[in-house]
């Protein structure tokens, strides 16, 4: 789980691994993980991002449907019937108001159905401000790893491998 602004679990996992290879591991005020391999030469920065796209609950209507806003770039038409998972494990499916022509979809026409009978029931599971990520299976097929957010996390893995391989260096290296 690691939508933009809520990457704590991802950051902690990366920091635990990076600590074996790096001199300093810190987090700045914005939540960036900064891993430093000390050197006396030039400062060199290697960067990757650990967040993922998702949604944030903005309103719960009287029917218990959760209205949401996007976190990152989303294509509205691709969201229909997609499963999302909130940090507390609650799952829901994105749907849209039946009267809306598909070509006219906006976030205002979409909602997350968690199976709640009404607003009070929904609020027992999800609060306004809760983040959710898109849930899809991870699997290996024909020697290839498939799954969501790999485009985001492969950069982190690459930086971890670089930290592991770098050894001693004259330059001051920053992995962010």
Predicted regions, residues:
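N-terminal hydrophobic/helix-forming segments and targeting peptides
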Residues: 2-176
